[in-house]
Amino acid sequence: MARYIGPKCKLARREGTDLFLKSGVRAIESKCNIEAAPGIHGQRRGRQSDYGTQLREKQKVRRIYGVLERQFSGYYKEAAGKKGATGENLLQLLECRLDNVVYRMGFGSTRAESRQLVSHKSVSVNGKTVNVPSYQVRAGDVVAIREKAKNQLRIVQALDLCAQRGRVEWVEVDTEKKSGVFKNVPARSDLSADINESLIVELYSK
């Protein structure tokens, strides 16, 4: 499946919630009516079946983190094979992706932009260049912007945006050096309450 490059508002309307795919502090423009489904007429949503609700939750999480279908299924299988709650394990695997950590540290204004920074070899982990967005960052790893990219305007602007929206507690960042430490894997209580991972577990358990 190809990566979606169309309007971000359309995805937000499809899922009925802000997916934080836009770069501004206010992610979705006021003209984007997320209460209405995509399309010219923007019909209101009717009652969904249990399966439909579960599927929409999976699609929402997949789009938030910018993960393709096959990748997401792989993460679920890995999460199910770990000790503990499968849903929490799944979210933690997604949070530990390098592109997501770069976003959480504020080096990219969106996860898509952060993924591009990684792919373009602008990011290092523990001093070594890593260009794989799905690379799993571990607690204690040092993630930094490489010297060649430190003066990019988009990185400076992204750090300013992050300062406005606030940075998560499980990363520590030196904005001058453009380097940060991934202090720990976040607990479920640290992550968004707008995600209902139990619906995803129910979907894959069928």
UniProtKB/Swiss-Prot annotation:
Organism superkingdom: Bacteria
GO molecular function: rRNA binding; structural constituent of ribosome
S4 RNA-binding domain boundaries: 96-156
Pfam families: Ribosomal_S4, S4
Function: One of the primary rRNA binding proteins, it binds directly to 16S rRNA where it nucleates assembly of the body of the 30S subunit.
UniProt-listed PANTHER family: 30S 40S RIBOSOMAL PROTEIN (PTHR11831), SMALL RIBOSOMAL SUBUNIT PROTEIN US4M (PTHR11831:SF4)
GO BP field: ribosomal small subunit biogenesis; translation
Gene Ontology cellular component list: small ribosomal subunit
Annotated protein name in UniProt: Small ribosomal subunit protein uS4
InterPro entries: Ribosomal_uS4, Ribosomal_uS4_bac-type, Ribosomal_uS4_CS, Ribosomal_uS4_N, S4_RNA-bd, S4_RNA-bd_sf
Native organism taxonomy: Bacteria, Pseudomonadati, Pseudomonadota, Gammaproteobacteria, Pseudomonadales
Record's keyword terms, sorted: Ribonucleoprotein, Ribosomal protein, RNA-binding, rRNA-binding
